[in-house]
Amino acid sequence: MEPTAPDLQLVPEVTKAVSVSAPDPGPCRTAVIAVVGISMAIVTLGVLSAFFSAQGAHVEHIAELHGIRFTSSLQQENSDFYRLLTHALQTLLHFLLRALQPLSLKQEADILQKGIQARLQEQGLSLAAYGTIVSVELTGRCEGPVTERDLKSGHCPGNVFSCQNGQCVSKENPECDDRVDCSDESDEAQCDCGWQPAWRSAGRIVGGVEAAPGEFPWQVSLRENHEHFCGATIIGARWLVSAAHCFNEFQDPAQWAAQAGSVHLSGSEASAVRTRVLRIAKHPAYDADTADFDVAVLELARPLPFGRYVQPACLPAATHVFPPGKKCLISGWGYLKEDFLVKPEVLQKATVELLDQSLCSSLYGHSLTDRMVCAGYLDGKVDSCQGDSGGPLVCEEPSGRFFLAGIVSWGIGCAEARRPGVYTRVTRLRDWILEVTSAADMPVVPTATPAPATPSTPWPTSPESWAPNTFAKPTAAPSPVPLHPSTTAKPQECGARPAMDKPTRIVGGISAVSGEVPWQASLKEGPRHFCGATVVGDRWLLSAAHCFNHTKVEQVQAHLGTVSLLGVGGSPVKLGLRRVALHPRYNPGILDFDVALLELAQPLVFNKYIQPVCLPLAIHKFPVGRKCMISGWGNMQEGNATKPDILQKASVGIIEQKMCGALYNFSLTDRMLCAGFLEGRVDSCQGDSGGPLACEETPGVFYLAGIVSWGIGCAQAKKPGVYARITRLKDWILKAMSSDPSSMARPHTSSTRLIPSEPPKTTAAGLIIPEATTSRLATPRATIRVTTRPLNTTLSARSTTTRGQTAAPSAPGTTIHSHLPDCGLAPPGALTRIVGGSAASLGEWPWQVSLWLRRREHRCGAVLVAERWLLSAAHCFDIYGDPMQWAAFLGTPFLSSTEGQLERVARIYRHPFYNIYTLDYDVALLELAGPVRRSRLVRPICLPGPARPPDGARCVITGWGSLREGGSMARQLQKAAVRVLSEQTCRRFYPVQISSRMLCAGFPQGGVDSCSGDAGGPLACREPSGQWVLTGVTSWGYGCGRPHFPGVYTRVAAVLGWIGQNIQE
């Protein structure tokens, strides 16, 4: 095995500032780095070469130079300095000194200085012109030649941030985080950019959702001969970045134009801007076979007019860290599915997760390089696709600014399982990008000779023409050398979203709009608002325990669905409280365990104005500096008892626990959390107590980090607000939700409760939330390749019809039979040996229907309930709502069979109360164009009576969905037996998401479940008479077959009235 050299630093004695560990003799020798030139270096190289040729040693390392003041001209990879220095270092890094005596520091410095000087003097270059080398260090062994790695220059090693004055800052991502880390304040000097937008929600590009105007102001559509061909990102008034492979075929800038400021490809908005592309610079090391260095810089013919809808994204520092697991955003006008059938007119957006590099590399046969980064999900479903190439992968940092982490590059298919998207890693190529944009007189790297004037093909005919060969061996090419930020790209303006409202303060703050904080509740005793509360379920609110020190519960009412204390606007709801549970360890003296769980007298109906916030996991981390939102109707300034009529909102930062304790001269407990600003100005105040501190963890999804508890004054300097920390209290919250009422009810009228020494507080905060906030665990069981998370989707033009506004079910005494007299009859023995799933036989489940999209592929299941009526899941039609796109295939368990009946769908009726976010009322009726031909293979199932099925009832689920989580779909109908779980058990597994229209079925240990592609299919239970009744419709679940996460089904008995009304009409 080849020995590895320890780290070595060569420092001249006169500037010795770093301790140097002397190398030990023996097998593990210190490697001496020297850059040797013509004169004195030739002798040194000769000696070393002769010695090492005999030893046969070989080692490769990353080298870092310290102390040279590199200018932009040195960053050109075709410059003499860069080329000679790189070659010289590479030459000597292949030697490992194993037998020589250690050199003195002066000898090491002399060899280094004279070697480089001689090498450069040969070419007429002077080292003195560029500074004095302070040190060179080996940062560890690496695979591949040094020219394929990062040869970094500057004062600071590794991923340490370098201030403009040379100070090194070891803090991760210090730039633009609203905290000064450099003594010259250079880390915060150009950061007036990228504030939090007023509205945003997550979705998908493949099967995705539309972006709002101004939501992605850095997004550009690149037009080749007037057709959208690729995406690009604005980084300066005259500069865009895109993918180099976009210009493999069309290389003449005259063929290209850029459209910005519009979410519509037609550019119909007044804000749309079009300009010509003046020149295209592809990275000189770009490899079309491996897609390595897949980046291009485009100069525009005229500068873009920055405004509300046109803004640049922030370029990250070379040391910027985007950790695996971070949620980021992709956007583009690429195809909505892999087979090129759908191209959106409106810009699509999606949330993806950054993946571990080693993991992603293993998925792609280890063909990834350091210039690539992966994002997506291992189970597929969300991805960029053809036409999105060159577009942005942007990540929001705690400061609220958006940084360009990647450029859409390549992938296998679109949204396929275990085939995430691959993006060009911007941090590795940032310095080359800035080199191009800052060198105004630098000749652009040729993209190729101009193409002849032949007719172009605007759209590729196959995915392969978009995806470079991903398995070719990458070629070695030197990485760019880091460069100090250039001002040409106007970083002070980057990342902004001025079309969106910006957050402000609660004390002296701004008003929220209807639906902006849909989880906010006002607790009133008579007409008086006294505390806030937060919706965490359809029957549950959270508030502060101290709110009930002197409060009579029976006199309290919760007001929701409106931002007005007077109940004006929105969808106001007023409900009494059934019971209140204070934490058993609540301490009114120090306000420890300051949390209360409130059960409403009746369940809420979620809509766009009333939504629950997500509860975080107990292990969830809300890092210091994270900007979160507070909201409430509390006092707008300290000492002023006047409360606002309109809900107030503000943004506050999470504060380090020990620092907060020091500010209060009080040891905060683990159940407390501080948020605000050390200089004050923004805070919650009296009347905000019990309200939410909500943090947006993924775009559009807010988690409850804290409950407004206490503080000294309101918005005073060095006295931030203190909140009850939800992660430390969640176990009790969940236990209280699922416990018996008698075990949690406590009297709250005792006069022995003490008022806190400092008045309780309330809050108001800013950062708009889209309406999709909860049900993050809910994975709708619909399509396998396109849309599988409709709870976060919206639809621009739906053709589905809503009928029957009567939601109350009828109350038949027994099973409701369909119009055909022999409903629910199946061959005997249908339940034998099916636990764990097995293939169904012909005629075994004659009511099972496969819904085909465009008569091309199975998308969802359905159930025959009458001669011309099917029942399915409403979320199956979130994206594709036009009944003309759907067909019903029934009468066979084989998807490839030619024997079944194929019927056209005439109309689709989704339940009028269907909630796209929570999947409540997730049911739809499909009317066929004509009645089905009844036979032993085609027969309707019976509808159930109003009663719930008995707990533990053994029922059957069927479908063609995935055979395992993330796997492929079945070609033959599958069946499995599951147990119906009690409502209490179901709520224990899903404490927030379960409504009275849902039921759970499965096994606590997992193993048997419905999965993607089964949505809309039946949960059928057999009655003693032998008839089968439709108990549930497959809706959603967390994963497939996971322990403690059973499948969730729409309870058919809860929507019988609506079904009967439509079928009768």
From Swiss-Prot:
Write down the InterPro entries for this protein, in alphabetical order. Answer: LDL_receptor-like_sf, LDrepeatLR_classA_rpt, Peptidase_S1_PA, Peptidase_S1_PA_chymotrypsin, Peptidase_S1A, Tmprss9, Trypsin_dom, TRYPSIN_HIS
Query: What is the regulatory mechanism acting on its activity?
Result: Inhibited by serine protease inhibitors PMSF and 4-(2-aminoethyl)benzenesulfonyl fluoride, but not by EDTA.
Gene Ontology CC annotations of this record = plasma membrane
- Catalytic site: H245, D294, S389, H546, D594, S689
- Pro residues bias: start-end ranges: 452-461
User: What residues bear carbohydrate chains?
Assistant: N549, N640, N665, N792
- What are the Peptidase S1 domain coordinates in residue numbering? 205-438, 506-738, 834-1064
Give the molecular function GO annotations. Answer: serine-type endopeptidase activity; serine-type peptidase activity
Q: Ranges in the Extracellular compartment?
A: 53-1065
Q: Where is this site: Cleavage?
A: R204, I205, R505, I506, R833, I834
Keyword terms, alphabetized: Cell membrane, Disulfide bond, Glycoprotein, Hydrolase, Membrane, Protease, Repeat, Serine protease, Signal-anchor, Transmembrane, Transmembrane helix
Q: What PANTHER family would the database entry show?
A: ACROSIN-RELATED, TRANSMEMBRANE SERINE PROTEASE 9
Q: What does this protein do, in the record's words?
A: Serase-1 and serase-2 are serine proteases that hydrolyze the peptides N-t-Boc-Gln-Ala-Arg-AMC and N-t-Boc-Gln-Gly-Arg-AMC. In contrast, N-t-Boc-Ala-Phe-Lys-AMC and N-t-Boc-Ala-Pro-Ala-AMC are not significantly hydrolyzed.
Q: What is this protein called?
A: Transmembrane protease serine 9
Q: Which organism is it from?
A: Mus musculus (Mouse)
Q: Which gene encodes it?
A: Tmprss9
